[in-house]
């Protein structure tokens, strides 16, 4: 879901090779050139920018819901258009480790120290759970500053699931955290093209690794 990135054509080619039985859907905007994209495509109207604060929250809400309506599958991987997930066994990893009532997400961008910060780089879950997460979100109005991943996770946990317990006590009730590098094997276009962004993520990831066992309580898995 997202804009047509420089990497998107290659990402789709790899996904077709790695997941030959998967139904691949691109959910993007009616302003994007999709002439070279070889998969099912849904184009939506861009949301109006919010004021005084703006971010990609409403873009994700519109784009993901449009994609979910198109897909008829039991297990769905929601991912970005500028980011490879190289692990060919990512669905097996989900089946073997993630409870069916949880969403599998990367550790990078997820923390117990910042309430409701659950990474939105990608999500892997049953269709039922992903639809619960995305179908019940009020659009962000821009009246206050908040990151998309926090807005989305808080809406799901607090507004939909009606759970107001402390985040550090309940995060693992709704999300199954796996490793960004060794489990998902993610390669991110922004890391390749923006040194400042790469440095920021590297620092954050190093800090999370330091306290990984204490914070996330997950098993480690390594493939290829």
Q: How should these model regions be labeled?
A:
Residues 3-18:
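Short, well-formed alpha-helical segments that are part of the catalytic scaffolds
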Residues 3-7, 55-66, 144-151:
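Soluble or luminal CAZymes and related metallo-dependent hydrolases
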Residues 9-12, 73, 87-96:
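Short alpha-helix within the catalytic core of nucleotide-sugar-dependent glycosyltransferases
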Residues 15-26, 39:
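Short loop->beta transition adjacent to catalytic acidic/histidine clusters or analogous donor-positioning motifs
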Residues 26-70:
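Active-site-proximal specificity loops/subdomain of glycosyltransferases
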Residues 76:
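Short aromatic/hydrophobic "clamp" motif used to bind/position activated sugar donors
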Residues 79-85:
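Acidic metal-phosphate-binding loop of nucleotide-sugar-dependent transferases
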Residues 85-91, 103-224:
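Catalytic core and acceptor-binding pocket of nucleotide-sugar-dependent glycosyltransferases
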């Amino acid at each position: 879901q997202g804009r047509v990135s420089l990497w998107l054509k290659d990402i789709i080619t790899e996904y077709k090779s790695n997941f030959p039985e998967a139904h691949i859907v691109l959910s993007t905007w009616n302003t994007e050139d999709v002439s070279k994209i070889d998969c099912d495509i849904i184009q939506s109207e861009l949301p109006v920018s919010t004021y005084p604060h703006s971010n990609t929250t409403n873009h994700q809400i519109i784009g993901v819901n449009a994609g979910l309506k198109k897909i008829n599958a039991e297990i769905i991987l929601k991912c970005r258009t500028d980011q490879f997930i190289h692990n060919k066994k990512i669905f097996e990893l989900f089946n073997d480790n993630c409870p069916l009532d949880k969403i599998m997400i990367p550790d990078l961008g997820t923390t117990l120290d910042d309430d409701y910060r659950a990474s939105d780089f990608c999500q892997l879950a049953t269709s039922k759970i992903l639809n619960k997460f995305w179908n019940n979100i009020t659009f962000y109005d821009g009246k206050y500053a908040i990151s998309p991943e926090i807005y989305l996770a808080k809406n799901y946990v607090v507004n939909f699931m009606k759970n107001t317990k402390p985040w550090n006590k309940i995060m693992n009730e709704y999300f199954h955290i796996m490793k960004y590098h060794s489990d998902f094997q993610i390669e991110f276009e922004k890391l390749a093209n923006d040194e400042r962004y790469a440095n920021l993520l590297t620092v954050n990831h190093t800090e999370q690794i330091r306290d990984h066992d204490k914070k996330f309580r997950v098993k480690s898995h390594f493939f290829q």
